[in-house]
Amino acid sequence: MSEDTFITQEGRLKGVPSSPLYSSSFHPSPYWDERPQLTKSGAAGDPVDLIVLHFISLPAGTFGGDAVDRLFMGTLDPDRRDWPQDPAWEPLKTLKGLHVSTHFFIRRNGEVIQYVPTVKRAWHAGLSNFRGRNACNDFSVGIELEGTGEVPFTAVQYQALGELLPAICRRHPVKWVTGHKFIAPGRKSDPGPFFDWGRTAQLLPAGVALAIDETDCDREALARRMAEHSN
């Protein structure tokens, strides 16, 4: 695998035929902005030192459709008449006007889709805190895995994650990998109880550690930030 082409200087992923990511693709999302550290200091400093893992399925428990892809690309229409007339699809209407994104999405079949270059800020973590720092979007890369908190993830998803995590760590000075639930406790639960953290630990390059303890979030600082946000 070529280190200089797998993730480019601009933070774009390129698939390699010999890897599970041969089916990788880039679907540009409109939902991103500049990382504030880079805006202030230019390209001289790279603040990205955290990877945040999530799960997602739309509707909940439905895999393989295009709803997640459309959500991140800003083309999700909750009023589409060609979607199933099923109560399970009704919650999608609450997503109307929601602007969210992620850097990467790993489908159940191992396919990897990138939406935002890693040098840019994707909108995946929301109100969050990691070890005293609020706004984790500022300094993290987000990876969404297609799944729920009720079923295990697939072997090929871990295989793809095993390719993707080291590639990101080569491009950015990543120190930690965490889950959304650990930076937004009480508000989020992903990547859920079926995510295999032990297996993930074996995928990490030297110098990168898991941060999966409740103390990794400064709850008081996060509560203050949430109170400010609600005013």
Regions found by a protein language model. Name each.
Residues 1-134:
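N-terminal catalytic cores of peptidoglycan-degrading enzymes
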Residues 2-24, 44, 134-139, 148-231:
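Basic/polar, cationic surfaces and motifs that engage anionic cell-wall
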